[in-house]
Curated annotation (Swiss-Prot):
<keyword id="KW-0732">Signal</keyword>
<keyword id="KW-0964">Secreted</keyword>
<dbReference type="GO" id="GO:0005576">
    <property type="term" value="C:extracellular region"/>
</dbReference>
<dbReference type="GO" id="GO:0090729">
    <property type="term" value="F:toxin activity"/>
</dbReference>
<feature type="modified residue" description="Isoleucine amide">
    <location>
        <position position="64"/>
    </location>
</feature>
<feature type="propeptide">
    <location>
        <begin position="20"/>
        <end position="43"/>
    </location>
</feature>
<protein>
    <recommendedName>
        <fullName>Conotoxin VnMLCL-031</fullName>
    </recommendedName>
</protein>
<keyword id="KW-0165">Cleavage on pair of basic residues</keyword>
<comment type="similarity">
    <text>Belongs to the conotoxin T superfamily.</text>
</comment>
<keyword id="KW-0528">Neurotoxin</keyword>
<keyword id="KW-0800">Toxin</keyword>
<feature type="signal peptide">
    <location>
        <begin position="1"/>
        <end position="19"/>
    </location>
</feature>
<keyword id="KW-0027">Amidation</keyword>
Amino acid sequence: MLCLPXFIILLLLASPAAPNPLQTRXQSNLIRAGPEDANIKTXKRVIISGLXXSILVPLIDAIIG
């Protein structure tokens, strides 16, 4: 009988320390992955637009001139 109050106190202390549910972890991973993916896509766009500008500008100048 003396163990029951101690067991209840341990349960109350352990409940806030419980890990997040799987869905919440998956959502936080998606949120963290979003900006990284956006930076990679932006870097690819910058590289592609730089290559396109370096190729298209001389081509257009050659056609016009």
